[in-house]
Amino acid sequence: MTSSWFQDPTLLAAMLGALLPFVSFVLIMVFTRPYPKLSATISVAAVSVSLICALSLLGRHWHLEQPIQYTAKWLVSGKLYVPFGFMLDQLSLLMLTIVAGISFLVQVYSLGYMAGDPGFARYYAFQSLFAWAMMTMTIAPTMLQFYVFWELVGLASYFLIGFYYEKFSASEAGKKAFVMTRLGDIAFFLGLLLVLLNFGNLNILDMNSVDITARMSPALITLSAILIFGGVAGKSAQFPLLTWLPDAMEGPTPVSALLHSATMVAAGVYMFARIFPFFSKSPTAMTIFLAIGTITMLLASTMAMVTRDIKQVWAFSTISQLGFMVMGLAAGSYFAGIFHLTTHAGFKALLFLCSGVFIHEYGTNDFFEIGKHGGRGLKVPIVCITLAAAALSGLPPLSGFFSKEAIMGGLAELPNPIWLWAGLLGAFLTAYYSFRLIFAILFPKEIEEVHHGEHGGHGHGEDHHHAGLYWVMAWPLIILAAVTLVLGFFQTPLENFLVGHHGGAEGHGGGHHAWLLYVAVGLALSGVALAWLEFGRKGASQVGFVERLEPVKTLFAERWYIDHFYRLFLDYVIYGIFSNLFTRNDRQVIDGGIDGLCRATVGGGRMLSFLQSGMLQYNLMVMFAVLALVALYFFF
């Protein structure tokens, strides 16, 4: 249904919640940037109101029957009509709440983490810009509006990743993220263009309807679905566009929590879910997506097994879990994919924010060094990070256990068992690399007595040691830990909320395979046990089985040489082709044109040189001949 915003408090709340962060961004950049504390207050207040609006909308419309829309004319050209506005349904209400909630907690945490940073006000301005773009994208009624704010999310992410722009590595990481996600966005745009030209409409509800099959052939739907999925691959770091995400750790740690939990990188998965019925109309495309998600999940898991950087471990785990979400959706398990996105938002934000406390206190990203300097002495962060790692590993009764089991159940419904076995292998690897990190901090080989904050921060330019703000950073951890503990028990209400109104979303199937639950948990516990043997028990070498195999360790540490392949491709194919093209153009067109003009001028001069013989009689004859011709022209 369509309503006017001033008559409907629902749409008023939607507009207020989405637009306030933009107002905050403008106020900070134009007026309050010289006043850091005031800027932070404005930003936190704005996102607080956004969270209140999102929660009120979710509660008010928990039993929503039909999507609520408010639209106005945006683009009108001939038969083309593109509206701009808001659409509220079960999926957008849930995602809006997640984005607002994580944004609020990250901004509160940042009051302690970023205190004293020279770019404090600028940081909160970019946080507000990001929140506005993400929330407005979430409730977009058309894919064109979705795409516009999708690009704004990418721009805001670039600003946040490259926040420490004076550092070369941070600047390069921001550019890499921006360029690699643009590659996927080009395919996304071409896919939307294909739908628009053949279907004539980019309204999300219309794209998800059965009518599209009458206007587009199966081949066209498959092609457009694959192209649109390019955007998912770029934003959600799916193979082969996955290597930018670990480098995005160059931004401040709270930024990592924001990007990796429920916002930028989850935007791709959200888009997959947003037009899930459209994608489902092409079984071929869904099989391709399933393969991409599986490859991504396994590759990222292996990369996480050898790194010593605490933020990179969780970055690789993000890529892997996004692969799990894509697998769930591509297997037809609409609810399982969204449920894992929801639970992942909580425990992944918790993992990064806990890591930020360790980095803040010890000035290093190396988790072996954190353990060596007494990381287990920080009681709240160590308890919370262990809890979140257990949720990431899929251990009961934490939220990650329930959502992973839903995905495994969906994979078990597929006729080919290879997808399920790949998922189970991923569960084992996830538990192993997660507790490799936990045990390295809890049970270091040696301990140095170091007072908190004694180290100079050399990780990502984050030298902010303000012990008095410890509890400002700790409260968001406690809230997220509570969410991680209880969220899984709300699986049934959430499933009724989402799937009860979503056609074709069945098939998560977790309850039909009791044996699968035991196998999955058993494999996760096996991963924890292996990590304990290698890193936790007394006298452990703290060298993993992969690290003992030097060629394999190098392969994983070099990220399967994917970046090297891209560099070779750029240097020898792209640069080579264009270099030869421009060289040939320079030599044959530009040089040839100039040289040809010179030769023509010289040749013409030689041809006319007989006119300048140097004889007076000849010159007089030519002069009189010209005068005679002029006279004939004028008089006759």
Predicted segments — roles?
Residues 1-13, 30-125, 197-218, 222, ...:
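Transmembrane helix-loop-helix hairpins at membrane boundaries of multipass inner-membrane proteins
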Residues 5-19, 35-43, 81-98, 136-149, ...:
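Membrane-entry segments of alpha-helical transmembrane domains in multi-pass membrane proteins
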Residues 17-32, 104, 233:
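N-terminal signal-anchor/start-transfer transmembrane helix
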Residues 36-49, 175-185, 376-385, 467-481, ...:
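Alpha-helical transmembrane segments and their helix-start/interface "positive-inside/aromatic belt" motifs
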Residues 105-146, 155-465, 489:
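Hydrophobic transmembrane alpha-helices and their helix-loop junctions in integral membrane proteins
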Residues 390-406, 480-499, 570, 576-577:
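Alpha-helical transmembrane segments and their membrane-interface junctions
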Residues 463-530:
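Hard-cation-handling environments
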Residues 494-515, 536-636:
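Aromatic-capped, Gly/Pro-kinked transmembrane alpha-helices
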